[in-house]
């Protein structure tokens, strides 16, 4: 068991003022949950986070616009950002970099660490330099093109080089041939993405949630269960 920490107070002795930023965060004036036609439940997820912070007792200002962070200095005490993907190059480091510039605390790792973590190819190279086992992989882009021959045996997993949360993953991301890799990689590159092709390997997806900084609370292992598409089962 662990104790929920007391509400953090600001320099005026009042509950800290928090700016909540997320692509589907509630916006003024009604701060209601937003509609969504894509896959996943991002509006509900972001709305739940907003309500949870508010229900704890914090003074929350919420926005779905990344440029709102420029109004943080002097108006809020902390930036709680889930603003990882939006229309700019390397968006995952924008909020943390700006918060560093205006010297205001924010959620998450420093921008240089985020830049490494969101670059799957660079992360793979870091792990390999530490002599950790990683699957074979190759980075592809429109400039480099796609090799005519497979550089390593399949089956293959094709994904965006940058980003997280399984963004862009579809059933055809699992490829049993290099011809299928070519098709999937070209689709991603036509959408403007660099690509990482890895050798597919079986495994499990385990997360260890950690809350807090100086005195973190480790919640234990969480095993992610995902329904496997027919194609994935066939090549496993």
Predicted feature residues:
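A short, glycine/Asx- and small/polar-enriched loop/turn
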Residues: 73-76, 150-153, 213
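ATP-binding N-terminal substructure of ATP-dependent carboxylate-amine bond-forming enzymes
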Residues: 1-106, 112, 141-147
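Short beta-strand segments
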Residues: 21-22, 159, 198
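Residue-level detector of structured alpha->beta connecting loops
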Residues: 75, 103, 153, 192-193
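Short hydrophobic/aromatic-enriched beta-strand-loop microsegments
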Residues: 80-81, 105-107, 134, 217-220
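A conserved helix-loop-beta module that forms one wall/lid of the active-site cleft
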Residues: 58, 96-171
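Phosphate-binding site of ATP-dependent enzymes
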Residues: 176-227, 231
């Amino acid at each position: 068991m662990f104790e929920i920490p007391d509400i953090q107070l600001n320099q005026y002795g009042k509950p800290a003022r928090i700016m909540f930023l997320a692509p589907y965060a509630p916006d003024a004036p009604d701060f209601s949950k937003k509609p969504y036609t894509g896959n996943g439940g991002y509006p509900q997820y972001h709305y739940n986070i907003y309500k949870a912070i508010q229900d704890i007792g914090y003074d929350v200002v919420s926005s779905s616009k990344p440029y709102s962070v420029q109004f943080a200095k002097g108006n809020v005490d902390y930036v709680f950002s889930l603003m990882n993907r939006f229309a700019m190059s390397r968006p995952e480091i924008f909020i943390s970099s700006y918060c560093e510039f205006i010297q205001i605390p924010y959620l998450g790792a420093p921008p240089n660490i985020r830049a490494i973590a969101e670059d799957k190819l660079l992360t793979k190279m870091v792990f390999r330099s530490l002599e950790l086992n990683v699957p074979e992989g190759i980075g592809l882009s429109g400039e480099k093109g796609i090799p005519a021959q497979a550089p390593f045996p399949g089956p293959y997993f094709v994904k965006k080089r940058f980003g997280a949360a399984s963004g862009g993953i579809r059933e055809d991301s699992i490829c049993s041939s290099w011809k299928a890799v070519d098709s999937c990689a070209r689709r991603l590159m036509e959408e403007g993405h660099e690509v990482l092709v890895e050798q597919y390997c079986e495994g499990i997806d385990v997360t260890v949630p950690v809350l807090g900084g100086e005195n973190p609370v480790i919640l234990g292992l969480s095993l992610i269960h995902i329904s496997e598409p027919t194609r994935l089962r066939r090549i496993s």
